[in-house]
Amino acid sequence: MAVLVAQIVAASVLIASLHARLPTPHEAATEHRTIHTVSLGSSRTDVLLHRVRADLGDSVSAVERFWGTDWTREITVVATGTLAQFGTEAHLDPRRQWGDIAAVAVADQVDLAGRVASGQRIVLAPGAADMSDSALRIVVTHELFHLAARTGTALDAPRWLTEGVADFVARPPAPVPRTARADTALPTDADLDQPGPQRSTGYDRAWWFARFVADAYGVDGLRRLYTRACGPGHADLGTAVREALGVDSVELQSRWAAWLTG
């Protein structure tokens, strides 16, 4: 699985000032949205962006089915040719390891009160060019959800839940492996911090939790939980669970454990 991270940054960086190649607008494969692409590599990243444009309609549709249509009409995708470019464009901490990250959704500025975000873009790592079409679609859809939900997501939202819901939107259902039964605790942000297998498992567990909520309480229940637990001015998780799902955290965890082991 390609692991994804969403990050918001405070300072605006103009891509055009750093690179001679300016974004070229293309009409996306959906009625009311436009995709702008920036290739920072060579023919390799050009081909990657062509694949993204050709398949973007399905990603937009998946996000709209879950989140609705009231989000930005402008979609910018940047394809990087080196890990150094990826780190720069995605504003990643150079002291941390990002080799297992396929893409990042970033914004230069976010006004949650006004529900406005500027400088939003999806930045693809060099390894994205080697992905299959289905894997690339998952990556782009995952990051597109973060872009769509940006102004409805607090800076201190529980990352594991934002990532799990993004994977729910992006990934097709698949059987939960028997090994998942070994850990029935709720996911945590710490699960996503360690590079390698632990981070991959953390994303899987967050995804399974989102699937569980959708199975047990409906897709509308999952969306309500995201809004209550991750939205601006959100409650703590226990309160959000009661408000969105009508159960307490103890009952939720019990049902989650039964879902994993059932």
State where each predicted segment sits.
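N-terminal hydrophobic targeting segments that direct proteins to the cell envelope
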Residues: I15-T30
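Hydrophobic membrane-insertion alpha-helices, especially the h-region
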Residues: M1-S17
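Juxtacatalytic substrate-recognition/specificity segment
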Residues: H26-L144, T151-P158, V176-P177, D236-L237
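Acidic/His/Gly-enriched intrinsically disordered linker/tail segments
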Residues: G114, S134-V139, L147, T151-G262
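Charged, low-complexity, helix-prone segments enriched in Lys/Glu/Asp/Gln
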Residues: L4, L49, V60, L252-L260
